[in-house]
Amino acid sequence: MQIQSHYKKGTLLFVLAIAVTLIAAIGTEPLYTDPYQLEYPDYFGNRISIPKNNPTTKQGVYLGRMLFYETKLSSNKRISCGSCHQQKLAFTDGKAFSPGINNVPTKRNSMSLANLLWVRNFFWDGRAKGLEEQAIIPINDPHEMGAYLDKAIKELQQTKVYPTLFRKAFGTAKITSDRIAKAIAQFERTLISANSSYDNYLKGKYTPSEEELNGMELFMNSAEASKNTRGASCAHCHGTPKMYMELFHNNGLDSIPKDRGREALTGLPNDKGRFRVVTLRNIALTAPYMHDGRFKNLEEVLNHYNEHIRPSKSLSLFLQGQSNESGGKNLGLTAKEKSNIISFLKMLTDTTFINNPAFSNPHLVRSK
């Protein structure tokens, strides 16, 4: 009996210790009980960006998805992150400039959110150093969502659904701007696009057409007339399987740019007109193009790089002296070559990405 009594007492103390530990953890730290499995091909590499204090969990991702499409996070209750980043358009919106609060247009074109897991500098000028920072900036921006976060948080706290979701994701029902940013960032890290015809080609499951193969070769090759090699020199900035490199370039849009680009952030003259290199995945879906949406279609983009590069002191070295013709003053691609390149670019469309129900608006599902 004495042994049994000590056993029960020891068990009770152990259970109490565990309970106290759990209560303490629940009160101060997120509960990371259900990890979200991020799936992507090996050729994307493992140089991913996930902060230690914001691991990706199923609970956090679902909460982030709800918040991504939550119009309560805008001052007029009509705009969400999903307004400017629509799934059917590979998380862009088809406009040169997005209409923000009171239909005031934003200053730059909405960027695709595909494959942000590998990105370290966000926005066209790279001003945000992480997805958590990126997620909150548009919400606070007076010209975008224009939210008064303290007021929005009170509204979310008074709903039936959000306190429960925050408790599941972070251990308590308390809603904060930091937790909002973390949850949205978790959701955005799941927006992986890796099931295009190009991906299937890399896996040996798709045979490109002659036009697509020719376009791929031109895309990857540099224009070197001296070596009798024809190319479009795209791979300098877009040559990885993810179709971008984490670089900033002045791509010759203007000799004197109206938008200073990265220079406004760094103050460096060499950054004038430089913008972040964007992914070309799903590029056929994300018109109009460039930071100001000046090009309506891919044909206009190819024409720009082929014959309309504007010189400036900060012009990318990759765009200087490139020509397929000996002594040529421009790239010198033929109409057929440009058409072939566009055929290749269309291989980068991932229809499963734009139709994945895990990325869709959950509020529409809940309202049915």
Tell me what each language-model feature is.
Residues E29-I137, D199-H304, I309-L317, N356-K368:
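Short glycine/threonine-rich turn/loop motifs
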Residues Q2-V61, V119, I137-N140, G146-E224, ...:
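Post-cleavage N-terminal segment of exported redox proteins
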Residues L12, T21, A96, N102, ...:
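Compositionally biased, intrinsically disordered low-complexity regions
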Residues R294-T352:
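Extracellular low-complexity, Gly/Ser/Thr-rich intrinsically disordered linkers
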Residues E155-T176, L253-K258, R262, R310-L331:
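Amphipathic, soluble alpha/beta structural segments
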